Amino acid sequence: MPKINRPRRGSLAFSPRKRAQSPIPKYKSWPEHSGAPALLGFAGYKVGMTHVLMVDDHKDSPTEGKEIMVPVTIIEIPTMKVAALRVYTKDTYGKHALTEIWAEPLDSQLSRRVTSPKNYDSTAAKKKYSDALAAGLVAEIYALAYTQPATMSGVPKKVPDLMEIKVAGGDIAKQYEYAFGLLGKEIRLSNVIETGAYADITAITIGKGTQGPVKRWGVTLRKRKHSVGGKERHVGTLGPWNPHHVRWEVPQSGQMGYQQRTEFNKRILKIGENGAEITPAGGFLNYGVIRNAYVVIKGSIPGPAKRLIRIRPAIRQGEHVVRSPAIQFVSVQSKQG
């Protein structure tokens, strides 16, 4: 007799599968960091994919020490600017923002995203932080940093993307001193992570709109003979007679894609400053020419071209060893086909 049971089609881990609230991904957790204070994140914009030839430095690999072809993703990473510091406190109900210390003066480009505060008193904000620090109420410090898409030609927008980036390392006083020194200044990816290290990549996936249960959940097509009097691409049943409602686990049609996803332990193969050296003739498909710094990531990442990509140091690197990759060749062949 054949097996009469099987695992359910599709994962319930990401339910409800609805559209992301914002194109800017949000982190709820950050990696642990010891040592000098540092920022734990950065952001860029997805360009496209190509391939490189590099020496396989993975220990015990069948091709160890030999040249292999590796698919890579390129992200354009113009410098970000720190607009403000946000100080958090914790109580029995969780984490709450205590105060914000904004840079003076603010960049005019930032007014496209937020309304610049009028009659802002930075002295009062600093005093509120000092009093909270003396009382032992300060729990975490974050930097409010924003991208500069106006410096890019591949992304047709000028509105900066504003996001929180955690400051870690040392005690709270050292974190504040480090972050305060960054107010109004530009930061680079090389200040956050090094070449050869592993990072977590977070983005909003490609949106596919409303899709049926077959494509959305992977349910089996009804047999041709059984679908003569009805439909072929739908579930065979919506559930039992009791309870008298359709349960949320039943695979049904609905929104597919445009959801936040994180891929862990993606290796940083190269961080370059001259985008022209990696741009193919005619530019990247659906993107164009890279005019700023860029980073080469091993493998694929979520989202279409032009999508905002957030990068943080790997939160669970495990046994991965950080080595400087030996790249022999980067393909700049046109992707036009």
UniProtKB/Swiss-Prot annotation:
Gene Ontology MF terms in the entry: rRNA binding; structural constituent of ribosome
Cellular component, GO annotation: cytosolic large ribosomal subunit
Biological-process GO terms, alphabetical: translation
SUPFAM superfamilies assigned: Translation proteins
Region (Disordered): 1-29
Role played: One of the primary rRNA binding proteins, it binds directly near the 3'-end of the 23S rRNA, where it nucleates assembly of the 50S subunit.
Protein's recorded name: Large ribosomal subunit protein uL3
Organism: Methanoregula boonei (strain DSM 21154 / JCM 14090 / 6A8)
Gene: rpl3
